[in-house]
Amino acid sequence: MALRENYREQLLDAAVLVVARDGLDHATTKAIAAEVAYNEVYIYRNFGNKEDLLQAAFNRADIGFVQNVMKHIDVMDEADRSLEERCHALWDPVWAFSVDKPDIVRFYLRYYYSVQYLTSAHELHHRNYQQLQARLSRYFRSSRDSWFLMAHVFETILSFCSHILSGELENTPAVSDEIFQLIFRTLQPYMLS
């Protein structure tokens, strides 16, 4: 069983690398299997088909992001800090996590904005974020607002990560702070102090 799980993890890693490097259109089962020197049959045995493999890779990346936020979210309950300080203390590790994984971010960007995401992973993505949304809703005036604002923050992070990955922006503390300020000023009117 451990060997099968090892195959699965290696194939997930390979799918991320191939999509990040070559795009979804070139992420064939042959290219993914070749990345780890496996026969394509291992994709079908472990995932059923390429689409299920890509969805599983997306799900793993999605859950990793949510877990990272959840790992640091307790800072939002520190009453001795201002709202801005608490939000900034949450921002720093979330931003670092996002920009420190360029292949995962490239894969995520390509999959998240694809038709395949809309047809097979959209609901999964919403389920992955339910726990985070429930936790974040306590910091907003309305739980309805928290869904929209969480999506806004998430997509803003993705957008700025893409600018950094393309070389348009440099990942510096000053740029991170500018992005934080942009997001914070947008969220502040909707947040509880």
Locate each region found by the language model.
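Short, leucine-enriched amphipathic alpha-helices that occur as contiguous helical runs
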Residues: 4, 8-16, 50, 152
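Short helix-capping/turn signature of helix-turn-helix
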Residues: 24, 47, 110-116
